[in-house]
Amino acid sequence: MPRTPAEPSSRSGAWASVQRTALSKVLVMGVAGVFGLINTRIIIGHFGTDAYAQNGLLATFPSLMPFTDLGIGAVILNTVAGSEDLPRDAVVRRTLTTAVRVLLISSLVIATTGVVLGLLGAWPTLLGEDLMDGGGTTATVCLLVYAAALPLSVGQRVIVGMGRSATQVISTGVVSPALTCMLLAAVVARLDAGNAVPVMSYLANTLVSLICIVVAWRATRPLLADAMRDVPRLRAVRGVRIIDTAGPQLVQSLVIPIAFQTDRLLLSHLGEDGSLAQYNLAAQLFNLLTQTVAVTGVAMWPHFAKARARGRIESPFAASTAFAGLGGALGLLL
């Protein structure tokens, strides 16, 4: 297929998606910021600073393990974005079937690892002195919840691949209010739930995957239903080759947490008393900046994937300049 320059309407559509995503993220951050302060006050006031520090420590599991999807997210995004008839696309269907199979294996490994570490009593050694009494069991339960929700994450990838990143971002707005409701329920019931706080946080985050899988299911009907039906049919429905796309994404996922997400573990092992709790407070502001730039960048992914599938040439320099300016402006504001 001959390559053609990018179409103006395509570029304007991509930037409109970025704008919607950025505005949605700002709105969600505002809501999350308010409820985040409420949650912090409830946790520290009713469950203590130790519970707050442990919650921040265990909350880093997903950041430390972004490789758990084994690069599948990139495969789904590219395939969905390049489809011309998404509900009936056989390639997308087989890709989703393969993705769910791989994620189920990853979930089983994560769950098994959590249980084994819990039975061996190895969590205090791995996570440091900021782990509360009984925190090992809490860490295991958090991993089990995370593992159970992992296959559902295909819904988020499908939505983003469809160019509806704003929908995925808005769905994350339920996390902080849901956690507030669970914390208030524990307070009203007078439960000594310090160790349960991280589990509540993981359950609240699972709501995002549930919402997105429902939205994706309805928007692509009957695609997801057919793909899920094929998951156990290993011999009748063969998978597709995904290593070419998933491999490079997996390498990035392995490197990034080592560079940026090991800070809390170091503080837990080497920091002074209270340093981890103080760091968690400061990290909330920094995460607002990085998350905004990240989600707006992901919003551009379907645009470039679709252009590549159609043989169009798209320059990334304008987007890179815009994101650099956005990051600098947000940094100055914070």
Language-model-detected regions and their locations in the chain:
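Alpha-helical transmembrane segments of multi-pass membrane transport and lipid-handling proteins
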Residues: M1-T4, T97-L127, V141, A185-A189, ...
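Interhelical loop/hinge segments that connect adjacent transmembrane helices in multipass membrane
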Residues: P2-V18, N195-S201, I213-F260, G311-R312
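Signature of the first transmembrane helix
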Residues: S17-A81, A111, V145, T180, ...
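Membrane-interface helix-capping segments at transmembrane helix termini in multi-pass transporters
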Residues: T49-Q54, L86-T97, A111-L143, A189-V199
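Transmembrane helix-bundle signature of multi-pass secondary active exporters and lipid flippases
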Residues: N55-L70, I256, Y279-V298, G327-G331
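Helix-loop junctions and terminal segments of transmembrane helices
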Residues: L70-L86, G161, A225, A282, ...
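Hydrophobic alpha-helical transmembrane segments
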Residues: G136, T140, I170-L224
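Membrane-interface junctions at transmembrane-helix termini in multi-pass inner-membrane proteins
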Residues: A147-T172, L191, K306
